[in-house]
Amino acid sequence: PGAMLSLALVGAGLAFAPRVPASAVMKLYRGREPDERHAGQLFHIVEALSNRAELPAIPRLYVIPSKTLNAFATGRPDDAAIGVTEGLLRALDVREVAAVVAHEISHIRNRDLIVMAVADVASRFLQFMSLLGVALFILLLPSMFAGTVRIPWVALSVLFASPMLANLMQLYLSRVREYDADLEAAYLTGDPDALASALGKLDRHTGRFWEDLVPTGRRVPFPSVLRSHPKTAKRIARLRELITPDSYPPRRRLPKVALRETPMVTSIGLGPIEMRPRYRLPGLWF
C-alpha cells in the first residue's frame, strides 16, 4: 500500500506540475501586464519571435518590479507567459532584450518548462523517499545492534545516493537545455551577437555584491557539474561561432527581427522598482 500511495503521489505531481496556470506563477512575483502604449516595442518583439517559433499562442508578457536583471518563462506552449524585470529592461538595449526574449521563447517552444517541471517533481520524490529511508534506518538501529534485524545495505545505499544522482542529472539536463535555447534564440533573431552581449552584461551584473563580501578565494569557480546553467564564457563562445553568416544552416537562416532605430522599451506606470531582492516560492532570486 505504501508503494502504491507513493506512486500515486508521484503520478499526481507529474500530471499537475505542467498545468499550473502561467498567470498564477506571475502573480507570485507581482508581475503586471504592461500597457501596449507604453511597451509597444516589447510587444512587437514577443509577437514577431513567437510567430517565427510557430508557437500555437503568443505568450503573455509581464513586467516584474525588480532591480535585478532577470527573465523567465512559465507555462505550456498554448498557455505561456514571459516575465522580464524592470532592471533588465533598463540595462539592456533593444537588440539584447529581443535576444533574451527569444531565449525564453525557445524554452517554451521546446517544452523545456514541462520537462524541467517533471524532472523537479521526480527529484523531490526521491529526496522524500531518501528521508524516509534515513528515518527507518534510525528506527531500526537498536534492532540491528541486537541482531534481530538485518539491514539491506545495498538497497539503503542506493536510496541514500539517489537524490544526489537525481540532482546531478537534473542540473545536467538544465545545462543542455540552456545551450539549445541559446542556439535556437540565435536562429530566431538572426542576431547571435545580441544574445552574447546580453549574457556578458548579465554575468557582469550578477554576483558582484556577494563576491565583494568574501575577500579570499572569491574567484574560485563553482564546479561545473553543480551548475544549473553552463558557464557564461562557454555560452558566449558558442554564440560567437554563429556570428559568421556561413555558419548558419541554410534552412534555419533568418533575417534579423525588424526593430525601430530608437531602442525604446519602457514600463511607465508600473510604480517604483522593488530594490530589495526577495526569495519567492519557486526558488528564484530577483
Language model regions located:
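Transmembrane alpha-helices and immediately adjacent membrane-cytoplasm interface residues
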Residues: 2-26, 47, 51, 158-170
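Peri-catalytic and regulatory segments of divalent metal-dependent proteins
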Residues: 13-117
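Cytosolic-facing loops and C-terminal tails of multi-pass membrane proteins
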Residues: 141-174, 184-286
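Post-HEXXH active-site segment of zinc metalloproteases
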Residues: 111-142, 195-208
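Phosphate-/nucleic-acid-contacting segments
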Residues: 181
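Alpha-helical membrane-inserting segments
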Residues: 12, 16, 20, 126, ...
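Alpha-helical membrane-embedding segments
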Residues: 35-45, 60-76, 133-137, 184-188, ...
